[in-house]
Design a protein with these regions (language model features):
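Conserved acidic-Pro-Pro-aromatic motif
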Residues: 25, 29-117
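Glycine-rich adenosyl-binding loop in Rossmann-like folds that engage adenosine-containing cofactors
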Residues: 1-37
């Protein structure tokens, strides 16, 4: 159930592609990965998705956040649909305590979010 390599090359796994650095990338919902692998609990979710973090977080159903204990993510204010304040607000509303790690006024940084389960 931990074989995520199958998502690398499958065509049409999801009907959305994103043009990035002169190549198309196949995208899928995190919900689909959780469902297909029958994941009941995720202790640690690391997200480094180069500006897609807002789309990904907004696509996760509310009840699926209950499965995720900790999220560590890189954010990109200049390209994501959600800036770091909006991400922290979203995660706080889902029951997470968030810590922001950002150098000065940089457009990117890290968010550490955890919840008691």
């Amino acid at each position: 159930k931990n074989d995520f390599k199958k998502y690398r090359d499958i065509k049409n796994i999801y009907n959305l592609t994103r043009h990035f650095k002169n190549s198309n990338k196949i995208l899928t919902h995190l919900k689909k990965i959780i469902d297909e692998n029958s994941l009941e609990k995720i202790d640690y979710l690391k997200m480094d998705c180069e500006g897609s973090e807002g789309h990904i977080l907004k696509s996760i159903p509310n009840d699926y956040f209950l499965k995720i204990r900790s999220i560590v993510m890189e954010f990109h204010n200049n390209v994501s649909i959600l800036n770091h304040n909006q991400i922290i607000h979203l995660l706080s509303n889902k029951g997470y305590q968030c810590i922001l790690n950002r150098n000065n006024n940089s457009e990117f940084g890290y968010i550490f979010a955890t919840r008691n389960q």
